[in-house]
Amino acid sequence: MTNQEISLIFSDIAAMLRVKKDNIFKIRAYEKVARSIAELKEPVEKLVAEGRLKEIPGAGEAIRKKLTELAASGRLAFYEKLKAEFPEKQSSSPVSGAL
């Protein structure tokens, strides 16, 4: 999975949390990490393999766990659960149907 695809997933999560009126700090964390991932020069999967996720700006412990899950399985249970709460058209991610 490319960094761009991962970034879009985290952007989608932020957007869905915003619609749900979730904690604004949580929303901002997902937005920040989405931007950080989009700007990375190295693949997220490489950072996961090398144990270097702390180098991603905005990637706290919960987000690092999600990145590890995504890199390992190509799926993210939290994202899938959120998507189930919204009509398919809410998602802007081109990989949303693939997950």
Model segments located where?
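Long, highly charged, low-complexity intrinsically disordered interaction regions
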Residues: M1-L99
